[in-house]
């Protein structure tokens, strides 16, 4: 008898991803790998990829929330690049963060200079008296 049966030893615990431990949807392991392979520094701490994944997830959720609102305003159910553009450019902080970013097929914000608008005149047309 070699004693290699199933009766001895503990069962191995189910693997739990670092993303699920942190309560995130974004992949912490992939972010960690990219930080290591990107030559940003010689060593990468354990908390850095978790923090970066959380920040990326928050920014993505914020942009998608605003883009979804823009799509709904245009009576559409699918977000297109135009909705992303409208969402980012109408939000002051996101516009500052992504000011130099060009979104393909995004178009521009509708804007007419005040000088070009027709002048408002009072419409009190008095009938000519006799």
From Swiss-Prot:
Q: Which Gene3D superfamilies match?
A: Histone, subunit A (1.10.20.10)
Phosphothreonine modification, residue list: 121
Q: Which residues carry this modification: N6-(beta-hydroxybutyryl)lysine?
A: 6, 37, 120, 126
Record keywords: Cell wall biogenesis/degradation included?
A: no
Give the modified residues of type N5-methylglutamine: 105
Q: Where is this region: Disordered?
A: 1-22
Q: Which residues carry this modification: Citrulline?
A: 4
Write down which residues bear the modification named N6-glutaryllysine.
96, 119-120, 126
- Compartments, as annotated in UniProt: Nucleus; Chromosome
Q: After translation, how is this protein modified? A: Deiminated on Arg-4 in granulocytes upon calcium entry.
Q: Which domain of life is it from?
A: Eukaryota
Oligomeric state and interaction partners are given as: The nucleosome is a histone octamer containing two molecules each of H2A, H2B, H3 and H4 assembled in one H3-H4 heterotetramer and two H2A-H2B heterodimers. The octamer wraps approximately 147 bp of DNA.
Q: Which protein are we looking at?
A: Histone H2A type 1-F
Origin species, per record, is Mus musculus
The taxonomy runs: Eukaryota, Metazoa, Chordata, Craniata, Vertebrata
């Amino acid at each position: 008898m070699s004693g290699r049966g199933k009766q001895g030893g503990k069962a191995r615990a189910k693997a739990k991803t670092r993303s699920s431990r942190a309560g995130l949807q974004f992949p912490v392991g992939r972010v960690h790998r990219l930080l290591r392979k990107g030559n940003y520094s010689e060593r990468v701490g354990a908390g850095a990829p978790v923090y970066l994944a959380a920040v990326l997830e928050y920014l993505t959720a914020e942009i998608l929330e605003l883009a979804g609102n823009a799509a709904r305003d245009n009576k559409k159910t699918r977000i297109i690049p135009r909705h992303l553009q409208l969402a980012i450019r109408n939000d002051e902080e996101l516009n500052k963060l992504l000011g130099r970013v060009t979104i393909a097929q995004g178009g521009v914000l509708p804007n007419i200079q005040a000088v070009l608008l027709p002048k408002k005149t009072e419409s009190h047309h008095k009938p000519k008296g006799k």
